[in-house]
């Protein structure tokens, strides 16, 4: 007995995705390939976000990924930010961003 996930070489559960597709009333019938493809898409997105968040963690001198790292990863990536534009991440905080007009004036005299 081999799971459909292992047949497809995936970590994400093909059977569970298939069940959700059936239970969700998205269509009358669900093809055999659809849940495999969708599980692969989910897995790719998860890997992409975790990769970026994993890079953000050491930058903040941490060894563990926290919601803040996920937030920074998503908001600093143009495509992920577009995809997850309407998503709020709990405990994510905001991107550091100060409008240019609010910054102190650069004067030629100040360079001592």
From Swiss-Prot:
Listed GO MF terms: DNA binding; protein heterodimerization activity; structural constituent of chromatin
InterPro entries in alphabetical order: Histone-fold, Histone_H2A, Histone_H2A/H2B/H3, Histone_H2A_C, Histone_H2A_CS
Subcellular location: Nucleus; Chromosome
Keywords tagged on the record: Chromosome, DNA-binding, Isopeptide bond, Methylation, Nucleosome core, Nucleus, Ubl conjugation
SUPFAM superfamilies xref list: Histone-fold
UniProt keyword Transport present: no
Crosslink feature (Glycyl lysine isopeptide (Lys-Gly) (interchain with G-Cter in ubiquitin)) location: 106
Record family assignment: Belongs to the histone H2A family.
Protein name as it appears in the record: Histone H2A, sperm
Record organism: Lytechinus pictus
